[in-house]
Amino acid sequence: VISVLLSMILGTFLGIIMTSQSKIVRLLTRFYLEFIRIMPQLVLLFIVYFGLARNFNINISGESSAIIVFTLWGTAEMGDLVRGAITSLPKHQFESGQALGLTKSQLYYYVIIPQVLRRLLPQAINLITRMIKTTSLVVLIGVVEVTKVGQQIIDSNRLTIPTASFWIYGTILVLYFLVCFPISKLAGHLEKHWSN
């Protein structure tokens, strides 16, 4: 939840910055985006959790590592979504607002942001769903979450209930489905509603 909120806020600012006219700013933000996209989240988790602890003598918990990594990843993805939504607007939208005498803040508030939100919201909700599903990776750095709890239940019942893994992982699948499906349906509904 913390990573999702931070990613949405920081990603919005990053996306706006990515539309800058400065080549240096665009180059730096593009490098950040591509670096984070190329690196698997699991590798980033290991780098933050094990690398920071060993190389910089920083004692960082698994939960903090997960928040850092998922915020970095979510910010990069959200930034690219915001950039894409802004740059997909026809140039005449900006020019028309300026021709009407709107200030830059009025132009964004009344013209640009409402259109960007229509294009962005379904994609942002899709990103939230992806982030939720990817959280299962944190079990590999010792964070206790639903997959880890499931594994502990399976381990403790392995001898008495041989089919425990089927039932536990099936339950975990249903839990992820119950969380992600409504979010996914909301994205589809908003996309359909705003496409008119």
What are these regions (language model features)?
Residues V1-N196:
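Transmembrane alpha-helices and adjacent helix-loop boundaries
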